[in-house]
Amino acid sequence: MSQVQVQVQNPSAALSGSQILNKNQSLLSQPLMSIPSTTSSLPSENAGRPIQNSALPSASITSTSAAAESITPTVELNALCMKLGKKPMYKPVDPYSRMQSTYNYNMRGGAYPPRYFYPFPVPPLLYQVELSVGGQQFNGKGKTRQAAKHDAAAKALRILQNEPLPERLEVNGRESEEENLNKSEISQVFEIALKRNLPVNFEVARESGPPHMKNFVTKVSVGEFVGEGEGKSKKISKKNAAIAVLEELKKLPPLPAVERVKPRIKKKTKPIVKPQTSPEYGQGINPISRLAQIQQAKKEKEPEYTLLTERGLPRRREFVMQVKVGNHTAEGTGTNKKVAKRNAAENMLEILGFKVPQAQPTKPALKSEEKTPIKKPGDGRKVTFFEPGSGDENGTSNKEDEFRMPYLSHQQLPAGILPMVPEVAQAVGVSQGHHTKDFTRAAPNPAKATVTAMIARELLYGGTSPTAETILKNNISSGHVPHGPLTRPSEQLDYLSRVQGFQVEYKDFPKNNKNEFVSLINCSSQPPLISHGIGKDVESCHDMAALNILKLLSELDQQSTEMPRTGNGPMSVCGRC
């Protein structure tokens, strides 16, 4: 085995034959790489790629070039034509091709000869497209039909890019013709007629020809303008008629420009926000909602409402509601559960130290079930409306309050009858002897009211009254005692008026629009009562009105004990037969 000692910038080392061969190859390769090349350097593998700038990301260059290449000439031409108001139309032309050989298929027998060849190579097909834009034509060629379109669009772009953009002007108060390219002639006729307030009428004037080849003539009239159109169908004839009359409508003078006045929207002023726990908060708010909001602001349990009792006659129910807030409880009464619940909430607000909200006239006064504020000394006289038998709804109202009773809230006045306010009562002839100029009247006698109520109840339920018979026997001048029960309410009321010494007066009205009689009754008791009845005849009207008065008189003792009434004006109820 031969050994060679090689020294290359390193200490000498003994190498074997195979190691010498590898070492020689490595030494020979090092000088070659360091020798500069005098000839032109060959292109590297990445020579064809663009040199990227380190400052710009490669993705931006790629996206910019891709975006530039994605916009084809046809897309650019479409955008330019929209600005110019022109429509490009592409028309394909038959591609050009030379005559080709039959490829030896013309041999008889249909067999190929032993030697066959193509006489010449087949040239590629060239597609042609003709582009027309606004009267100008451009021809494009390409290997594909799309390439031919791009060629024609590129030629059109070179010429159309130099044309100025047209100014959009309104013609005859209408949109320009370019804007109406996508609108049918019939739509344009209706638009012009609508702006000029002209009537439009399409009518088929005549039709001719055999059933399978009919010809229609349609006549259109737009105000004073008339046009006719002919076609093989009604639709085509209607369109042609619209085209004919549209030419006349375009000659009309332009409409005057009218400036529309923009409506002024008044901004609502923001109310002053008060804390929900302050006593002044909630003036005018429903007491039920106000009480719930106060409890929510305090972060306490919401109020609990409970129905305690129901009392009174079926038509004169009185409900008692109880509300509980923490350790406090309050009650409220009313003709229905809603009113009782509201009154209970008001009483609870007073217990908690909040001001009771003033009643808002959300409903007509005669139908309102709420009371006006409590009268203060020196403020003058107050009038509050309430229902008969409703009692003291608030439980905290002053006993000196004066009340006036309208007709029942769940009933309505018939046609021709006015509410019994003092002025109306005076107009229909109600006795005004009890009303002085200062609207004062002596308070009713509670004992007499109790006797009257007792007699009325006896007459209502039995037809006879032992109490009245005893009074008549003691008072010789009062009259005779009737024999047998009284069945009609009018007779019972007449008998009661003779016993107690008050007057009853009936006033009859003509038939209303429902062919019914209406009668008005005036009772001069203390307090005076007014009612009316409706029926098929006068007698039934009198009975119904008298029945209402008797029912009120039967409850006088309850009203006198629960709530004294010293106010002016008669009490009024209504009834229907």
UniProtKB/Swiss-Prot annotation:
GO biological process, one term: cellular response to oxidative stress
Subcellular location: Cytoplasm; Rough endoplasmic reticulum
Tissues where the protein occurs: Widely expressed. Expressed in brain, pancreas, heart, skeletal muscles, liver, lung, kidney and placenta.
Start-end of Polar residues biased regions: 34-44
Coiled-coil region: none
Transmembrane regions: none
UniProt modified residues of type N-acetylserine: S2
InterPro entries xref list: DRBM-containing_protein, dsRBD_dom, STAU1_DSRM_3, Staufen_C
PTM-bearing positions, type Asymmetric dimethylarginine: R108, R115
SUPFAM superfamilies: dsRNA-binding domain-like
Omega-N-methylarginine: modified positions: R115
One annotated Gene Ontology cellular component of this protein: glutamatergic synapse
This protein's UniProt keywords: Acetylation, Cytoplasm, Endoplasmic reticulum, Host-virus interaction, Methylation, Phosphoprotein, Repeat, RNA-binding
Broad class of the protein's primary localization: cytoplasm
Region annotated Disordered, chain positions: 34-55, 360-397
Basic and acidic residues bias: start-end ranges: 366-384
Domain DRBM: start-end pairs: 72-162, 184-251, 286-354
Residues modified as Phosphoserine: S176, S278, S390
GO terms, molecular function: double-stranded RNA binding; mRNA binding; protein phosphatase 1 binding; RNA binding
Subunit: Binds tubulin. Binds with low affinity single-stranded RNA or DNA homopolymers. Interacts with CASC3 in an RNA-dependent manner. Identified in a mRNP complex, at least composed of DHX9, DDX3X, ELAVL1, HNRNPU, IGF2BP1, ILF3, PABPC1, PCBP2, PTBP2, STAU1, STAU2, SYNCRIP and YBX1. (Microbial infection) Interacts with HERV-K rec and gag proteins.
Biological role stated in the UniProt entry: Binds double-stranded RNA (regardless of the sequence) and tubulin. May play a role in specific positioning of mRNAs at given sites in the cell by cross-linking cytoskeletal and RNA components, and in stimulating their translation at the site. (Microbial infection) Plays a role in virus particles production of many viruses including of HIV-1, HERV-K, ebola virus and influenza virus. Acts by interacting with various viral proteins involved in particle budding process.
Domain remark from Swiss-Prot or TrEMBL: One of the DRDB could be involved in RER binding.
Protein name as it appears in the record: Double-stranded RNA-binding protein Staufen homolog 1
Organism: Homo sapiens
Organism lineage string: Eukaryota, Metazoa, Chordata, Craniata, Vertebrata
